[in-house]
């Protein structure tokens, strides 16, 4: 049984058309989109401060040790011939660069 779905997606800085191709994890159990904070910094994505932090909880209900989500980025996401402007919450994803939730 297939447990993970990975896609090659283009991600561009908004209004700069300067992008990269990255493998993203498609997660049907998540409704939001996330980008790893180290990846966002490494590629110079512009961080936008959230008005209210988003508390992150672990599966067991405890607060995540990395703390709350306080920033997001806006990017152009490109898959095949489709381009969509999206916002992703910035957090620590470990070995995964981007998680795309199912909206």
Predicted regions and their residues:
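Aspartic protease
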Residues: 2-4, 8-10, 16-103
